[in-house]
């Protein structure tokens, strides 16, 4: 018999980081007179996130071991007709897992920030923001209704805007945060349309009530069209996910988010904003399962993102941007799994990816600190001798990312590839090719970065920006010195070690329970009569050890190994090869360097085109038709008519007599003509 979780305990989970954020933001900044210093600021915010993590871990234990569940409304905000707008929580396996991932990664980022942002003037403000980010994501994942989900959705978007543009005196950061904000508005427009359609046709925003009416919705068409209503709803919802989870073509904001400080890059890419779209689709699985058209659309978008965003990672030289493009590619893998109805596999990869991606981002930040804020991997090399902890943990994160057997990424990534192979959707063939090819691409660019940073010759003195401030921030006073690389302080390396542990073991420990047990039983719905993917995976699974051993005979393992070997040869053994290939394939390199010209298209076709259209409508519609014809034309016409009638009013009696005689004559003529 399942137990019920305590509402007050659950409420404390999001409120703890919110209180820490409020105290830091009010008392630790100029807004509140800087009443508290840096030490008290990070103590309060870390304490809030630590409390949230402990309570989340306790909740996960109750859900996984005791079968506890919670689905209640805490507060009714308003009721409009029969539509209630409520604040409530739904806690099941999916929610509990997300709560732990969000709070643990956030806790690591908070600790890391103490060292990374030590000399930044906005230290207290940054801690207030990242705690607020944590609160927003927790409210999103714990929601039991779509209105609260939407508020959490918009809150993470707002705080990401503040954090990407944290250094507001840096023009590129301001451009990046505005870009992220605007691109996400496009996705959010679709998202709110989907929610509105559910509210209009299901009459509720509550998950449980809406899912109970899913079958009824699937029988309806959109009024005035022949489109299936459930398909329109699902595609609208997924457009929202395309924005938040950076799926092609709404992916363009994510690489530019690297303009923010490294700690927030880790939090955005690992556990908060970009995972929101994947979580939302998994939560809405009872709806998506009823539309194969939507599932095909999702699978195609995910496959394009997984493969083609990986290609862009190959030509990046900024260490953070390499990791950013790997995030785009891995989000594509998760999306492909959603399209294959393998929702549990998608969120399983979300979980494993959160740990090793946070590790890789924080490891990149540690390298940036050790290299005195140089971010160009072409001017590094041999760093492992100076930064052993960062080296080992980054290696573990890279091995997890490429899906090395027994590492966490292997269990989730290989499960995605197998799920797509078992899918019978029309898009599955293309998607399977994309995720297989993506294995080689991921291994290649991941170990290109690894080899260029940690191995080979030291190339620090070759950096033309060494004395020109090629930095990712403005807070390091020793960024221009001539000292060599150095290991980061313990407050930076300890989070790396703590993240490396789940990056290695969490997949091995949890795959049986999460994918083939009943952990997601009440949280995720799969129509087994139509979609047999999870049944096929369960039949082929014989334990994590057997799965890892069997992997050495499969294509993904050899593709990953080939990617590592090719990268090793090109960047350590024969460094002249990349330049030669670049010259031979120059047109392709130009396309990749310009990111498929998506930014050019968005700016010159969409943005400038919309502006030109607006100017045209203003000139023709507003100035010519409205002002020129209707407004100004009407008074000119009145003036002309009045000027003409004024001439008739001469004031002379004989003029009026003449008009009267003419009028009588015309009337008599008319009547005579009628009587003929």
PLM region spans:
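Aromatic-capped, Gly/Pro-kinked transmembrane alpha-helices
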Residues: 82, 87, 512-558, 569-676
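Hydrophobic alpha-helical transmembrane segments of polytopic
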Residues: 10-17, 41, 45-55, 95-102, ...
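Hard-cation-handling environments
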Residues: 460, 467-468, 473, 482-564
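Transmembrane helix-loop-helix hairpins at membrane boundaries of multipass inner-membrane proteins
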Residues: 1-11, 15, 27-128, 201-225, ...
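Membrane-entry segments of alpha-helical transmembrane domains in multi-pass membrane proteins
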Residues: 2-16, 36-47, 83-101, 139-152, ...
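Hydrophobic transmembrane alpha-helices and their helix-loop junctions in integral membrane proteins
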Residues: 108-152, 158-484, 502, 508
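Membrane-interfacial helical/loop segments at transmembrane boundaries in membrane proteins
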Residues: 69-84, 206-222, 412-423, 513-547
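Hydrophobic alpha-helical membrane-insertion segments
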Residues: 47-63, 187-200, 394-402, 495-518, ...
